[in-house]
Amino acid sequence: MKDERIVLALKSVAPGTPLREGLEQILRAKTGGLIVIGDTAKIMEVVEGGFAINTDYSPAYLYELAKMDGAIILSEDGKKILYANAQLVPDPAIPSSETGIRHRTAERVAKQTNALVIAISQRRSVITLYQGNFKYSLSEVSVILNKANQAIATLEKYRAVLDKTLMRLTNLEFDDMVTLLDVAKALQRVEMVLRIEREIERYIWELGSEGRLISMQLEELIANVEDEGLLIIQDYSLLGPEKTPEGILSLIRTWSSEDLLDYSLIVRALGYPGSASILDQPVSPRGYRILDKIPRLPVAVIENLVQTFGNLKNIMSASIEELDDVEGIGEVRARSIKEGLKKLREQTNYTL
């Protein structure tokens, strides 16, 4: 929920939005400003004085009204200017790390009401967002673009390492030589890529209309990464149906960077004992990830195959007649599965 509020806050003030245009005009004029988004009862409790406007929002109106000392109150959707020149009187007992009066007031109002409050520094020419305990200072578009491009370059390197790790895992799965260490390494690399993705997403939200190219690059670089992670978990998790692959991946997402480097923690999340010696234990994949790579093979059929044969090794060694006996598989599909597995193995050996 907190993340959703942060996303909405960053998107609402991204370059190209009407609100950002108004903020930039105030910034250039060096008048400073204090803007509250929303007019709930909780927000109006801290508002005193000022005058009602209740007119459609426009960047020019926001700029003109900011010339007065008081705060400006906008509607929740930012489409109407409700009040101007209002005084904000939050509870002075609420702790604040800010020194300036405008920013201290903004922080306290945000903490007391959970509203998005925007403070524009007259002296430093900085736009700062407050919402609950969240605080974020907006940077110049050129600075964010530079950071985003650096993050994309890092993501490219991490994706290349992930692809090699997954290819090696695929090869080991065909040879039935996987250990828990191989599984942990693959899941670790998946999460590392997803963490960089989340960092770049924040830059994209903040860039708004300026972030289209970065967004396209990101989409290409993270294609199928989360799906691969979920399928690996399906292949190796010992946990019951109450612990879904999505739930396990979400758990790993909450870990610190240090915890993510601990392979024994990763295998413990899959339901194995957490000792270091367990990492050398051989394991056999159920076959979800490999079977998912065969074209036009429905999820229901993959599930029936795994339920019938138990693991990838048994599926690979099954005859066409045995495959044909599985629900949802006729002779044509049975041959397609055998041929698909053969091609995948040849491609893996060729790539390596």
Swiss-Prot record:
Ligand binding (ATP): G70, L88, I101, R102, H103, R104, T105
Gene3D superfamilies (alphabetical): 5' to 3' exonuclease, C-terminal subdomain, DNA integrity scanning linker region, DNA integrity scanning protein, DisA, N-terminal domain
Keyword set, alphabetical order: ATP-binding, DNA damage, DNA repair, DNA-binding, Magnesium, Nucleotide-binding, Nucleotidyltransferase, Transferase
SUPFAM superfamilies: RuvA domain 2-like, YojJ-like
Protein purpose: Participates in a DNA-damage check-point that is active prior to asymmetric division when DNA is damaged. DisA forms globular foci that rapidly scan along the chromosomes during sporulation, searching for lesions. When a lesion is present, DisA pauses at the lesion site. This triggers a cellular response that culminates in a temporary block in sporulation initiation.
Record domain DAC: where: 3-143
ATP-binding recorded as keyword: yes
PANTHER family noted in UniProt: DIADENYLATE CYCLASE (PTHR34185), DNA INTEGRITY SCANNING PROTEIN DISA (PTHR34185:SF3)
Subunit relationships: Homooctamer.
GO molecular function, a single term: diadenylate cyclase activity
Pfam families: DAC, DisA-linker, HHH_2
Gene (UniProt): disA
Signal peptide extent: none
Chemical reaction(s) catalysed: 2 ATP = 3',3'-c-di-AMP + 2 diphosphate
Superkingdom of origin organism: Bacteria
Top EC class, one word: transferase
Family: Belongs to the DisA family.
EC number in record: 2.7.7.85
Name this protein carries in UniProt: DNA integrity scanning protein DisA
Mitochondrion among keywords: no
GO biological process per UniProt: DNA repair
Cofactor: Mg(2+)
